[in-house]
A protein has these predicted regions:
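Acidic (Asp/Glu)-rich catalytic clusters
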Residues: 270-274, 300-311, 390-392, 413-415
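His/Asp/Glu-enriched, well-ordered alpha-helical/loop segment
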Residues: 356-367, 371-397, 401-402, 407-411, ...
Length: 664
């Protein structure tokens, strides 16, 4: 080995000397004609130096040139497709480092309860029950009691009133609690005397009756009764999720929990027929040493790069606890708002160790869910033990969420090389109840991005969709400001823990690629890497801070192929990071955009008194403005409306969109 290495070194040295003596040899190879060129752009490569460029050239699925305008000319041949970016901003294809791809898709097939008022959810359940056969299950996902006027957990009686003849199963946004009715409890054989399982709880009223909310492992006896989606429905759901991801410029996504059946029956066929183009990093779900997934780990080596670098199967998902919102996150000490309760560990220490050992000893990366400080501590103990017993080069073990830790455990994790996979919008959602749950002292080790980065670690960012909206620009905004997409609180929640804009972008690009062992092929725009990138309607690095949440993807390119193009034929109004929904199209006239009055005031939650003029009131601001009626629909000028309500209005021509800023 040493002798061969010496010969190779001598040959390389000779070649270096030759090139130095005859530098023209280094330039002898002519640049090849690119398949496509994108030029005249504002390109953030997110390389080590965070350098910028103006042009990209692509051959096949790879970048063959990244640089300036003069240099790209050599790559333009007679058949090269050239796109003038017109100065628009380009960033690497975004990497969603923690979500449930199938869960997002399947949530689009059931009742959408995402952060909606309780009465709206109950109306949706009632509507489903009226058209469903008696006994048919009614499902939904996304409710969040912390945003309701009454933040108490909901009851089974509320669902009984609107769906007495159908079992109802509504999953909380975080996926760690369900809200069910009496029919669902009856079918599952669950009564007030049913004992809580390890890692779950049947919540009770003060007099010991079933409340109607169930957490974590206690959900399984009920969810197991619900007829599953067919294979065709699962494939449809996955493609729906892909469509949504591409629309945001997300070209890669980690799926936080995949069964062997789902891998073989859904992912592989869709990749094989060419309809699935999303790059997926799949974590195999592991909950038992006797499961099909455990057997898969014993018999199948971890591998990546399947289907031309579109699928990796080299990591394992474990659940160690539940969620903070459901009070099922495992804590070292009692919850501050529930004496005598410390949450739920899914497994004993020995059970967790055996599961971690199985995955680790078979060469897999770990991507284990841990919210509470006790759950994180348990995982770190197990990681530390298996790493000591069987040292492996560069295992890149991850903890998913890495949400609440003691300061000592944060340092321990970083010293061990454990990668924190965090979701920045979790902080801005949980801020509504986090300090009530764990108090002011423990919050110092929670959602502590600045602390983690300053100690020398990177952070892998994502949304945990469908727990949160999959929009990455909400996450980037939260990372930089510590505010929700509503702009709250105005000064940011614990703003000392903010990331810089560069760090936040790295958390969605180069750092995300490193978390997948894919830093050599994606995450930055460099020659030789995959041509994955997104064109934005504004400059992420320099736009007003409050506009980050409103960024729109104009074009998404994966492996050189355009997989999404934004429709800019009609103007969009972006309110609190989301486009308002209009039943009638806005009207564009020279210098003005008119929006449907009723659709707009309903979308922003304002009151209106309308006639020949309309008076719109939002909070303590009112504006009176003329009404234009077209085909029976009343319209008002968008700028006059929102500036009259004390808001900033910014027009982005590239996306034909208007961003509505915060109150002045």
């Amino acid at each position: 080995m040493r002798k061969g290495f010496g010969r190779l070194t001598a040959m390389l040295l000779a070649l270096v000397m030759l090139v130095s003596l005859f530098p023209t040899l280094a330039l002898a190879a002519e640049p090849v004609a690119a398949d496509s060129v994108y030029r005249n752009g504002n390109i953030y490569t997110v390389d080590e130096d965070f350098s910028t460029a103006t042009a990209l050239a692509i051959k096949g699925d790879r970048l063959i040139y990244v640089g300036g305008e003069a240099g790209v000319e050599a790559y333009i041949g007679p058949n090269t497709k050239v796109t003038d970016l017109g100065g628009k901003t380009v960033i690497p294809g975004l990497i969603e480092s923690h979500m449930h791809i199938n869960g997002l898709g399947e949530s689009l097939l059931i009742i959408d309860a995402f952060w909606k008022p309780k009465d709206v959810i109950l109306e949706a359940v009632k509507a489903e029950a009226e058209k469903a056969e008696p006994g048919a299950w009614i499902q939904g996902r996304g409710w969040m009691n912390t945003v309701w006027e009454n933040t108490d957990y909901p009851t089974k009686e509320e669902l009984d009133a609107v769906a007495p003849n159908n079992p109802v199963y509504l999953t909380r946004a975080d996926g760690h609690m369900c809200w069910v009715n009496s029919k669902a409890f009856e079918l599952a054989g669950i009564t007030k005397d049913t004992p809580d399982p390890q890692g779950g709880e049947y919540l009770k009223t003060e007099d010991g009756e079933l409340l109607g909310c169930v957490t974590d492992t206690a959900m399984y006896p009920i969810s197991g009764l619900i007829p599953g989606f067919s294979i065709e429905q699962k494939r449809e759901a996955l493609l729906l999720a892909q469509e949504q991801l591409f629309s945001y410029g997300l070209t890669s996504a980690m799926n936080a929990g995949t069964s062997v059946e789902y891998l073989n029956e859904v992912y592989k066929p869709l990749y094989e027929n060419g309809s699935l183009k999303l790059r997926s990093y799949l974590l195999i779900s592991l909950s038992s040493l006797e499961s099909p997934e455990a057997e898969y780990l014993r018999t199948t080596k971890p591998e990546g790069g399947f289907y031309d670098n579109h699928m990796d199967v080299r990591s394992v998902k474990l659940f160690s606890d539940g969620s903070l919102g459901a009070r099922s996150a495992a804590m070292l000490e009692d919850y501050s708002d529930r004496a005598g309760h410390t949450g739920n560990n899914r497994f004993t220490d020995e059970q967790m160790y055996e599961l971690v050992k199985l995955a680790y000893d078979n060469g897999y990366q770990m991507g284990s869910h841990a919210i509470g400080d006790a759950a994180n501590h348990q995982l770190l103990d197990c990681y530390e033990k298996v790493m000591a017993e069987n040292p492996r080069e560069d295992p890149r073990l991850r903890i998913e969420h890495f949400q609440i830790l003691t300061l000592d455990d944060i340092q321990r994790a970083i010293d061990m090389g454990v990668l924190p996979s965090m979701q920045t919008t979790h902080a801005t959602s949980d801020m509504l109840m986090a300090e009530d749950r764990i108090g002011t002292e423990r919050i110092k080790g929670a959602y502590a991005w600045r602390t983690i980065i300053d100690k020398g670690s990177i952070i892998l960012n994502g949304t945990d969709a469908p727990v949160e909206l999959v929009n990455p620009y909400h996450s980037l905004y939260a990372a930089v400001t510590r505010k929700s997409r509503l702009g709250e609180p105005p000064e940011g929640w614990h703003p000392d823990q903010c990331m810089t804009r560069e760090e936040a972008l790295r958390s969605y690009t180069s750092w995300g690629a490193y978390g997948e062992f894919n830093e050599d092929i994606k995450g930055t725009l460099e020659v030789g890497k995959l041509a994955d990138f997104v064109v934005l309607d504004r400059d992420y690095m320099t736009c007003p801070e409050e506009d980050i949440k409103d960024i729109q993807a104009l074009l998404t390119v994966s492996g050189g192929e355009v997989v999404y193009t934004r429709d800019t034929s009609a103007p969009a109004v972006i309110w609190n990071g989301l486009p308002l929904t209009f039943n009638s199209k806005p009207i564009t006239e020279p210098g003005s955009i008119y929006v449907p009055l009723n659709d707009t005031v309903n979308g922003i939650g304002a009151a209106v008194v309308a006639g020949k003029e309309a008076t719109v009131t939002l909070n303590d601001k009112s504006v009176t403005l003329p009404v234009k009626t077209v085909d029976g629909v009343d319209y008002v000028a968008v700028r006059a409306l929102f500036e009259g309500l004390g808001r900033n209005v910014t027009w982005y021509a590239g996306s034909n969109s208007v961003s509505i800023g915060w109150l002045k």
